[in-house]
Amino acid sequence: VFMLFKSDFKEKNDYVNYLNKRCIENGFSGIVIIETHEDADNLGEDNGNIKFLREPATSLNLFRKSPRNIIFRLKNKIGKISRKISSGYIEINDGNKIYREAINYKNKKVIRGLCLEWDNTPRHGERGYIITPPTKEMFMEYMDSIKDTELLIINAWNEWCEGMILEPTEENKYKYLEWIKEWSEKNENRIDGV
């Protein structure tokens, strides 16, 4: 299994074919490619590769494009213009609204993602944005909405100071791990295939 973080490069097919050939030469049945995408409306060609919707980017893009959110887009546009004149505007997104977009997305042929919170302002300053954490109820609703999918990839890689935390903290204690445990225990029979 090989995951391509940015899968829209022109040499992709040649590269994947080469990797597949090498895998077969070394006794494997081939390679499985997972392509990472941020735009749920543009998953590219159906090339047999598995598509993964990276969060929070995918749901944030759905949220920003939704006609329901025109006021948010206008406010954000004004904020970006004012940022060029002075400083102080940072885009703050309601995690529950972002999760709602994720819940409403119904494509079952993709691997879904999960991100519990986001804040890349330490790295990007005013160019960054914040996504507030969802409520426990919204998290559970999202998990219920994707429970029939085979895989879930949790974005908790905090290498670039983007606030994607899953691990215990002084502020949240074990909250997110406890949410996952609670949901898993509630759905234990489905997960074990019983």
Where are these regions (language model features)?
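The substrate-binding groove and active-site-proximal loops of carbohydrate-active enzymes
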Residues: V1-E11, R83-N93, E126-K136, E162-E171
